[in-house]
Design a protein with these regions (language model features):
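N-terminal helix-turn-helix DNA-binding module of bacterial transcription factors
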Residues: 1-62, 338-342
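Hinge/beta->alpha junction and helix N-cap segments in small-molecule ligand-binding domains
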Residues: 53, 70-80, 98-107, 129, ...
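Residue-level detector of anion-binding/catalytic polar loops
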Residues: 15, 50, 90-95, 121, ...
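Short beta-strand segments enriched in small/hydrophobic residues
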Residues: 16-21, 59-72, 184-190
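Flexible loop/turn connectors
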Residues: 235, 239-343
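Short helix-capping segments at alpha-helix termini
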Residues: 91-92, 143, 208-215, 240-243, ...
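Alpha-helical recognition/docking segments in bacterial nutrient-uptake
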Residues: 61-175, 179, 237-239, 243
């Protein structure tokens, strides 16, 4: 098996971006000392590292095909992004290939290697966690392959990106719950290895600080972006000697699990308010207080597609970052005993 960029970087005692710049002939751009560059080249030679020549060759070979790699298309968040990317690509005369990694680093790596060989002129990626995925993306970007990341940031990856203000939105959800009267807040967080999850957890803590509320370790639980995580976290929170009166969920899957557990508890959990991210179309009908940070999925997709097409068509600007705001909306429950009507 050929050596990877990460292995070269480790052998030379440098970061992956530094190794990428040296091996792609851009050491001068990064002001990398010649001694360091020589150490990287020596490590590459010793390990038998071969750069991604395919990615470099594709810079001059246009197919009018773009690639999109997301974690799961069953999630409405990514499905809406994919739809917006496809519409923008089609309007500009490009075909879109879509792949879903399922948060599996091995599958993500497979797509990152396969899509450029199809070939695609450029990629939009919501990165799955894992150092090998990070190294593969850094190698593609270092080879000059057009690349845009969405929703998640990777340290050291030098490319265009579109993200949302997850930290600010999480703090906003805390403010919304405290405005409803909540004073003991819990959070069912996402994976520690995912940037978006870390930002939302940090925003939750910031929101508590602003509200003058304490952070309790027993009212915070990180885990996968899954319904199961929401169920398990809510069970732990409700079993606490002082259960929360408000729960923040790090994404829509986790929120669904939290709501399942609350519904199963019946009247005893009826007044627990909830908050979450992404579109929740059923929010007004839940019968409990809820706050939602609505993400601009379509705008994310359009912005990413526009940036990628500009790169494919020759844009040489420095890497750009677009940070989109999230709107926080609240839905108080209907007064008890009211009934809807209509003809």
């Amino acid at each position: 098996m050929p050596a990877t960029l990460r292995q070269v970087a480790e052998a030379a005692g440098v970061s992956i971006p530094t190794a990428s710049r040296v091996l792609s002939g851009r050491a001068a751009e990064g002001r990398i000392p010649e001694a360091t560059a020589e150490r990287v080249r020596a490590a590459a030679a010793k390990l038998g590292y071969r750069p991604n020549v395919l990615a470099r060759s594709l810079r001059t070979r246009r197919t009018r095909t773009l690639g999109l790699v997301v974690t799961e298309l069953a999630n409405p968040f990514y499905a809406t992004i994919a739809g917006a990317v496809e519409a923008a690509a089609s309007a500009s005369g490009y075909t879109l290939i879509i792949a879903a990694s399922g948060e599996d680093p091995a599958r993500a790596l497979e797509y990152l290697r396969e899509l450029p060989s199809r070939p695609a002129d450029g990629l939009i990626v919501a990165p799955a966690p894992g150092s090998e995925v990070e190294a593969a993306l850094i190698e593609l970007a270092g080879a000059g392959f057009p690349l845009v990341t969405v929703d998640r940031l990777l340290p050291g990856l030098d490319c265009d990106r579109v993200v949302t203000d997850s930290r600010g939105a999480a703090a906003g959800l805390v403010a919304a719950l405290t405005a409803m009267g909540c004073r003991r807040l819990a959070m069912a967080g996402g994976p520690d290895g995912v940037w978006t999850a870390r930002e939302r957890s940090a925003g939750f803590r910031e929101g508590l600080d602003r509200a003058g509320l304490p952070f309790s370790e027993h009212l915070f639980r990180s885990g996968e972006f899954s319904v199961e995580q929401g169920r398990a976290a809510a069970e732990v929170f409700l079993a606490s000697p002082q259960p929360p009166d408000g729960i923040v969920a790090a994404n829509n899957r986790i929120l669904a699990g939290v709501l399942e557990t609350l519904a199963a508890r019946g009247e005893s959990a009826r007044n627990v308010a909830v908050a979450g991210f992404d579109g929740v179309p059923y929010a007004p009908f839940l019968g409990r207080p809820i706050a939602v940070a609505e993400q601009p999925e379509a705008e994310i997709g359009r912005a990413a597609a526009g940036m990628l097409i500009e790169r494919v068509e020759g844009c040489k600007d420095a890497p750009r970052e677009v940070v989109l705001p999230l709107a926080v909306r609240t839905f108080p429950p209907e007064p008890a005993g009211t009934e809807g009507g209509g003809s």
